[in-house]
């Protein structure tokens, strides 16, 4: 005879550290997320990106509400995703550095500006997406930003994808 679910008072609630480590066991791709507002480029490393829909084509990104990127992407209404390959690890490290200067942060990152949105896109990314924001959903300490894809490009010479797993960058090799 099976027992029912345990009484809620008998269960331990997960703590933030355990949750973070458990999520670290889920391998994700690594991307550069960009936006541009008031003639200033904003960029950050993001692994919390996924497709939402094919018709219409939608992507989502999760953005920390306390970070400077949050208000910029909401103000701009458009953003770009560049999918990183293994040689882009220095870019991923740089754009994940808290407190880096806003002005000139893309000076060391070879990029161009998207034709549809004007956001910075990595020159040799595995693929790029330009998006226009269609919805923003508050979600705890982050916002889920949903965007309609208005442009897609793919590298003619795809390389090894950069992954993030157990708090480290990895590749499939």
What are these regions (language model features)?
Residues 1-173:
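Basic, polyanion-binding surface patches
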């Amino acid at each position: 005879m099976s027992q029912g679910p345990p009484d809620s008072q008998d269960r331990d609630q997960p703590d933030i550290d355990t949750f973070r480590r458990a999520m670290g066991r889920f391998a994700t791709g690594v991307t550069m997320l960009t936006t541009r507002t008031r003639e200033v480029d904003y960029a950050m490393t993001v692994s919390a990106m996924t497709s939402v829909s094919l018709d219409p084509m939608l992507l989502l990104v999760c953005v920390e509400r306390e970070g400077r990127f949050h208000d910029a992407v909401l103000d701009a209404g458009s953003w770009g995703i560049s999918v990183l390959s293994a040689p882009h690890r220095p870019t991923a490290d740089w754009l994940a550095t808290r407190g880096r200067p806003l002005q000139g942060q893309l000076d060391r990152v070879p990029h161009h500006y998207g034709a549809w949105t004007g956001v910075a896109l990595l020159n040799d990314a595995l693929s790029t997406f330009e998006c226009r924001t269609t919805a923003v959903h508050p979600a705890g300490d982050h916002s889920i930003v949903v965007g309609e894809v208005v442009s897609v490009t793919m590298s003619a010479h795809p390389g090894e994808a950069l992954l993030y797993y157990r708090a480290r960058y990895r590749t499939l090799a």
